[in-house]
Amino acid sequence: MATFSQKPAEVEKKWVIIDAEGLVVGRLASIIAMRLRGKHKATFTPHVDDGDNVIVINADKVVFTGKKYSDKVYYWHTGFAGGIKERTARQIIEGRFPERVLEKAVERMVPRGPLGRRQMKNLRVYAGSNHPHEAQQPVALDVAVLNKKNVRSA
């Protein structure tokens, strides 16, 4: 019996919505990355984009464990000499685009390459509770129920 390999035309993508309020960033990002890649499906094929479309709401209400909220530092470089920049998780979450913390966490858990970039386009993260994807009829995924460590009460 030959190993099953799914073809791109056979892929069935579902829409999933996750409420990120009170959820731990890394644990949530891990679940989202698995959904984006399609590893939760029995038909998973490493070279095919067979993951689901994931919508995340309330991304500004995610939590960190320990002192990561104030101590975790995100670095980037401007390209100019001495152009290293940094921001803490607290500064980003309290800033203009708090959803970027979760986007960056998921991005770092997805393979870096053409397929990973295509899979990241199936992720939509919103800071508030409103999203423009009601027409897709997304199915709610309750991450808090999967494991009690996924939720952190402040």
UniProtKB/Swiss-Prot annotation:
Q: Which organism is it from?
A: Rhizobium leguminosarum bv. trifolii (strain WSM2304)
Question: Which Gene Ontology BP terms does the record give?
Answer: negative regulation of translation; translation
Role of this protein:
This protein is one of the early assembly proteins of the 50S ribosomal subunit, although it is not seen to bind rRNA by itself. It is important during the early stages of 50S assembly.
* SUPFAM superfamilies from the UniProt entry: Ribosomal protein L13
User: What InterPro entries has UniProt attached to this entry?
Assistant: Ribosomal_uL13, Ribosomal_uL13_bac-type, Ribosomal_uL13_sf
Q: Which family does it belong to?
A: Belongs to the universal ribosomal protein uL13 family.
Protein's UniProt name: Large ribosomal subunit protein uL13
Traced from the root, the source organism's taxonomic lineage reads: Bacteria, Pseudomonadati, Pseudomonadota, Alphaproteobacteria, Hyphomicrobiales
Tell me a Gene Ontology molecular-function term this record carries: structural constituent of ribosome
Keyword Ribosomal protein appears in the UniProt entry: yes
Q: Which UniProt keywords apply?
A: Ribonucleoprotein, Ribosomal protein
